[in-house]
Amino acid sequence: MYKKILIASLALIAGLASCKKDDPTPSPNPPSGLTIDGVASTLEFYQLDTAHLSVAGVAKDAAAKAVWAVNGAKAAEGATFDFTTAHPGKYEVTLTVDGKSAKHTYTVAPRFSEGAFLLNEGNFGNETGSLTYIHPSKKLVIDQAYYRVNGTKLGNVCQDLAFGNDQIYIISQNGPKNGGEGLLTIARSNSLEKVKVYNDETLAQQWPTHIAVLRDQIYLRTDRNGIYRGTADGGFVSIPGTSKAKKLRMAQIGERLFALTSDSKVLMIQGTQVVRELDLSPAKPSGIAVSHDGTLWVSTTSPNAILKVDPTPDNFVALDTHVLDKSISSGWSATSAFFAHGDKLYFTGQSSVIYCHDFATSKTSQIIDVKTIDGVGTSANVYYNSLGVDPATGELYYAAFEDYGTYNKKNVTMVLKADGTKLLLKEKVNSFPAGFYFIPNAASRTGANR
């Protein structure tokens, strides 16, 4: 399995290793002669990185009989040892040769504190959902990230996730099928280490598709009975007046949750009640997101437009509307028709062409047709929840595949600058994309699922 790990292995050779000032001095000091080659001092690296270690200071035949142990447990024999782990923590690596020992302590840091996740539905018939981790500045992509950390699989047809309480909440539509664990998976957001898996057959029958987390409350939008509220321990109860909630991402501001409906409304939900409704008729809502100034962006078709909406209960109205000359339809997508960075809103109309509408200047421009990017071509034939935009950096994310018969063999995932310049491109790391999600970090981010 590890041959397929798409990571940049950390070569821990003495001349290149960087020491942390607050690291303790290794103790005890190794006896004269025997050393662990490939280290300079106690080092910090990340989950799934690899430290390539070897025996030094003894004869070749003696080195071949070396025994390596990690935290006191035998891990390998021989002159070399590749140390890797999926879990953060401190690890003492001990080398023993002919009764002599040398030791080093490693601090393994959480891998997933920044960057983005691509959630994948997986094939309904024979797969489960999965997470692909992306860090464009490090040119790093790790497919099957949750599985690599936990050794278990997400539920069948994962369609949405949310961040909250330093955790990541992943909802699957069909729960524990095809070897997947469950309906709702909760993991530590910075390490992906499993916290809890929740299953509820009754709730699963409602086909949950989208999730939002407000403090300890979990909101689930379902196909069959609108929006439910509960906790990680269960107790999910349907919220009256939400039965027409659309199969699209929701947005949150403070204690209020916002959802779109099939009868052209924006619902404002607080607690277990719909406290306000904004009627957009005859327009049809196609996406919603929190703006950088704390208001709401809402897109519609018939007409194609972008609205800025006041999210306060006392003035729940559209403040401004820009009509577009391009389609901003969400089609069959379950994410949103658009994604925003500042006053710039990016959309595709379910195509391979990315457009940008600048709300400050009222101008719409074409950024790029991703099919024209070297290495893409027909691998971007099918738009399937393909677009994402990092709300902090403005970088564009795009994942697509050639056709439904070869989705797992001919697909592409990429990151672009805001002008369409390619930053990163990987093949075969998506499987029916469910959308991109950007990890909350020191840069303040707002809104559900961002």
Task: Tell me what each language-model feature is.
Residues Y46-A59:
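A short beta-strand segment in extracellular, disulfide-stabilized domains
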Residues A116-N126, I170-G179, V213, L220-R224, ...:
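Conserved beta-strand positions in repeat-built beta-propeller and related beta-rich domains
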Residues Y228-S352, H357:
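Acidic, serine/threonine- and glycine-rich low-complexity intrinsically disordered segments
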